[in-house]
């Protein structure tokens, strides 16, 4: 019994369909050519506005009696701000997101017919995306005029909490999906470069007339790789910055709440906050590793097998590859695990200050 191999375009198509499903649940499927603002989009915006209004009024009414309630409410504000940033970025860069999606679909169609090695690299990229997606997988406000001590008031408040939570969960998930998909492709570009370099070396060793054409393909591929990273940096600039900053602030607020023991859900939420912080930073580190590997693979070209004019063509690319574009946080910090560790050290320092403060006031 023989098993039919799945075509890379089919594998990638399943990923895109899954993304369309999650994005459409929050009315923000901007990667669809026929997308229009709909009732779900409007409902999502209403939920966001309601969350901030009711959180503000609740904190204002409770703050004088219990100031720690402000910290409890602030913990989840970070996640809401992350969701808003992802939503605004999706609308602001809708054309770019749609363009990259079409680009990637065309890339899969173009390279899957070039041989089994290319098809294997494409399928491997889809598997990587699915593996990362599998890693990503109530609120503190009341409605003014609604008595939560009554059954009807409690159910009304709980219903609004649930709507905000579901929209927030799917909204954050949809934003993370596109981040993981787009920033997961440079690893595919590296795999394809390995195959291109192999073909060039074989052609150069045989003094084939195709060597120059293959070299030009590699030069254009490196230019595309650099341009792709720059576009991703532009699209995800605000998302990355908001994700890292709000995750850090949310962790600090949640740690203080844990010390006070006022919110049982804080233990779960702090894991979510740390997960969001490190997920983005790990993807940034993968891009850094990919940049290094991309440069090293260019050095694997058999330089002395090339003609002199072709040797001169490759020197500028080798120089450019040693200074690659990186994904930045706030335009100056590299998105990497090292940055996450620095933030964690800062959080630990603030945490020890909290402990001393509480000990002095006991």
How should these model regions be labeled?
Residues 2-74, 106-183, 188, 195-213, ...:
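Helix-loop-helix junctions within predominantly alpha-helical proteins
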Residues 76, 80, 96-99, 103, ...:
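Charged, amphipathic alpha-helical oligomerization/scaffolding segments
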Residues 93, 100, 118, 186, ...:
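Alpha-helical interaction elements in eukaryotic regulators
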Residues 153-157, 176, 196-265, 269-290, ...:
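Multipass alpha-helical transmembrane domains of eukaryotic endomembrane proteins
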């Amino acid at each position: 019994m023989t098993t039919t191999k799945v075509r890379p375009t089919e594998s990638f198509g399943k990923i895109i369909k899954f993304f369309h499903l999650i994005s459409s649940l929050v009315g923000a499927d901007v990667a669809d050519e026929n997308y229009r603002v709909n009732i779900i989009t409007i409902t999502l915006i209403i939920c966001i506005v309601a969350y901030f209004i009711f959180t503000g009024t609740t904190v204002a009414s409770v703050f004088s009696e219990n100031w720690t309630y402000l910290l409890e409410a602030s913990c989840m504000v970070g996640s809401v701000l992350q969701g808003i940033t992802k939503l605004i970025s999706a609308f602001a860069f809708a054309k770019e997101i749609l363009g990259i999606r079409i680009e990637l679909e065309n890339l899969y169609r173009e390279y899957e017919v070039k041989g089994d090695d290319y098809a294997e690299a494409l399928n491997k990229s889809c598997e990587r995306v699915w593996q990362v997606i599998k890693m990503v997988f109530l609120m503190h406000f009341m409605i003014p005029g609604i008595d939560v001590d009554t059954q009807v008031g409690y159910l009304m408040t709980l219903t609004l909490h649930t709507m905000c939570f579901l929209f927030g969960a799917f909204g954050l998930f949809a934003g993370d999906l596109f981040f993981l998909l787009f920033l997961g492709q440079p690893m595919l570009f590296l795999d394809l470069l390995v195959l291109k370099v192999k073909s060039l070396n074989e052609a150069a060793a045989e003094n084939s007339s195709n060597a120059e054409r293959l070299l030009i393909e590699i030069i254009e591929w490196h230019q595309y790789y650099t341009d792709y990273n720059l576009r991703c940096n532009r699209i995800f600039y605000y998302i990355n910055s908001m994700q890292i900053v709000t995750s850090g602030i949310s962790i600090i607020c949640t740690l203080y709440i844990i010390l006070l023991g006022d919110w049982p859900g804080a233990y779960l939420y702090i894991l979510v906050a740390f997960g969001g912080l490190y997920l983005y930073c790990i993807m940034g580190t993968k891009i850094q590793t990919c940049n290094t590997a991309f440069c090293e693979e260019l050095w694997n070209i058999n330089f002395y097998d090339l003609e002199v004019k072709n040797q001169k063509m490759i020197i500028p690319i080798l120089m450019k590859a040693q200074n690659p574009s990186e994904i930045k946080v706030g335009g100056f910090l590299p998105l990497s695990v090292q940055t996450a560790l620095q933030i964690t050290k800062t959080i630990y320092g603030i945490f020890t200050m909290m402990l001393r403060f509480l000990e002095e006031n006991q």
